[in-house]
Amino acid sequence: MSAPPHGFNEDTATRRLLRSRPPAAALAWVESVVGGSVEAVRALRGGLSSAVHLVTVAGERMVLRRYVRPETPVDDPGIADHEARALDFVDQVPIPTPRLLATDLAGVETGVPTILMSWLPGRVEWAPSNMDGWLRGMTNLLPKIHDAPLPAPGVIRPFRTYRQHSYDPPPWTRWPGVWQRGVQIAHGPVPGGHHVFLHRDFHPGNVLWRRGKVSGLVDWQAASIGPASVDVGHCRVNLLSYGTEVVDRFTTLWEQASGLRYD
């Protein structure tokens, strides 16, 4: 049996797995829990961890996430259940977030762990015309997340390093040594500091924009309890392609919005 695709690759087989139309059983489940007929289905581009489709039922748009990758039960068991609990919890966070509609956590009806949630208007912005406004819009979200009252123990799991099938450098990296050093650091001690509610995967690809304003924050399956610097640091890494000045500006704006220091 061949190894599953590298966690940072999207080869042809993975792309087909994630983008293909959901099976009839999954769409029948949607119809049964919503009480209407599926009118349209479209794959949503983005992450590599699951198959995500925009589904229209009786004129209402909703998002169907199916954890179809075969390595998911090993890399992150219980992820669908955790996402469902996170979506319930973020209802109290004062930012637009998806609303949980239904779950098939064991995949009894749909074949794989499945979540149905509300759709949020907006689109991901990777080429902002106003860089400072773009950064400010993101940094203003973080204090609202981190200031949420902590849930009861066990509702949201503590921060941990991502687990996956392989930590080997992907074939496209030009600096495998730097990659391996980054993996070592990521698996080191958890940063110190006051623990708060975290998005855990906070970066531009999960922030939706509409008419120049933030319209939503999506992908809550990695939500955790840990130091605020985890969300800040994760986003900093994802901003490196814009240059270190942008990374530093993001950090400064977050410090201004939160009243905290990034160490």
Regions found by a protein language model. Give the residues of each.
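An alpha-helical support segment within catalytic cores of ATP-dependent transferases
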Residues: R21-S37, V108, P143-R200, R210-G212
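Short, surface-exposed acidic
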Residues: V34-V41, G259-D263
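Active-site acidic catalytic loop and adjacent metal/ATP-binding pocket
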Residues: R45, S49-T56, V63-L64, L100, ...
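Regulatory N- and C-terminal appendages and interdomain linkers associated
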Residues: M1-G36, V112
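Active-site activation/catalytic loop segments of kinase-like enzymes and analogous catalytic loops
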Residues: V230-R261
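ATP-binding pocket architecture of kinase catalytic cores
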Residues: R42-P158, R174-G177, G192
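Conserved protein kinase catalytic core
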Residues: E71, F89, V124, V207, ...
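Conserved strand-to-helix beginnings and helix N-cap segments that scaffold or border functional pockets
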Residues: P77, P128, S229, V247-D248
